[in-house]
A protein has these predicted regions:
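HotDog/MaoC-like acyl-thioester-processing domains
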Residues: 2-14, 78-81, 119-169
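Short Pro/Gly-enriched beta-strand edge/turn motifs at strand-loop
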Residues: 15-22, 112, 126
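Active-site-proximal helix-loop elements at catalytic-domain edges
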Residues: 18-36
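A generic structural signal for short beta-strands and their flanking turns/coil linkers
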Residues: 33, 42-44, 109-113, 124, ...
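Catalytic strand-loop segment that frames the active site of acyl-thioester-processing enzymes
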Residues: 33-63
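Hydrophobic residues in beta-strands and at strand termini
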Residues: 48-50, 117, 164
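Compact, glycine-rich, soluble single-domain proteins
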Residues: 59-78
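Hydrophobic beta-strand-centered segment that forms part of the acyl-chain substrate-binding groove
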Residues: 77-127, 132
Length: 169
C-alpha cells in the first residue's frame, strides 16, 4: 500500500498564506482601502484599519457608507475566491501549481449587492466575515457581516450574488 508523502503542516500553511497574500495583492482597491485578511484554516476575517480618509460625516464622525459597502463587497468577493482557490489547492494538480505561481482563476462578477446599514460605523477598525451560501457552476450567493468592537453588534451586513467565471486556470 503506497500512501502519498505528507507535507509538513508548516509548509502547507506557508503556501496557503502566500497564495492569499498574492490574491489580495492583485486587487488595487483592497490596497487603497488598506484592507487585510487573517486566515484561520479555510476561514477569512477581513480587517479595515481606521483612517481619517474613511470618514464621510466629520460631525459625527462616521465611516462613509461607500467605504463600508466597498469593504463588505471586497470581503464577499475574497471569501468566494478563497473558497475556489482553497478547493483547487487541496485537490492538487495543474490548478494548484498555477496558483503557487500566482495565476488565479478569473474573479466572479457582481450581479447585485445589497447592503443593510444597521448602525453608524464609528471611527475605529472594522472587521467582516463572509459566508458562501451557495456556489454553483454559474451563480454564487454570499452573505457578509461587519462589526467593530463587538462581533454581536453588527454595523452593516450585505448579500451579494455573483456570476461565476470559468474556473479553469
Amino acid at each position: 500500500m503506497n500512501r502519498p508523502k505528507l507535507e509538513p503542516v508548516q509548509d502547507v500553511k506557508q503556501r496557503r498564506d502566500a497564495a492569499l497574500a498574492q490574491l489580495v495583492g492583485s486587487i488595487p482597491y483592497i490596497r487603497h482601502l488598506g484592507v487585510n485578511f487573517d486566515r484561520r484554516g479555510d476561514e477569512l476575517t477581513a480587517n479595515m484599519p481606521f483612517s481619517e480618509s474613511l470618514i464621510g460625516n466629520p460631525f459625527l464622525p462616521a465611516i462613509h457608507g461607500g467605504a463600508t459597502g466597498a469593504f463588505l463587497e471586497i470581503t464577499a468577493l475574497m471569501e468566494l475566491m478563497w473558497s475556489i482557490v482553497w478547493e483547487q489547492m487541496e485537490n492538487g494538480g495543474p490548478a494548484a501549481e498555477a496558483i503557487e505561481r500566482g495565476k488565479f482563476p478569473a474573479m466572479p462578477k457582481t450581479i447585485d449587492f445589497t447592503v443593510d446599514y444597521l448602525r453608524t460605523g464609528l471611527p475605529r477598525d472594522a472587521y467582516a466575515r463572509a459566508r458562501v451560501n451557495r456556489s454553483g457552476r454559474r451563480f454564487a450567493s454570499v452573505h457578509v457581516e461587519a462589526w467593530q468592537d463587538n462581533k454581536t453588534k453588527i454595523f452593516a451586513q450585505a448579500t451579494g450574488h455573483f456570476l461565476m467565471p470559468d474556473l479553469s486556470i
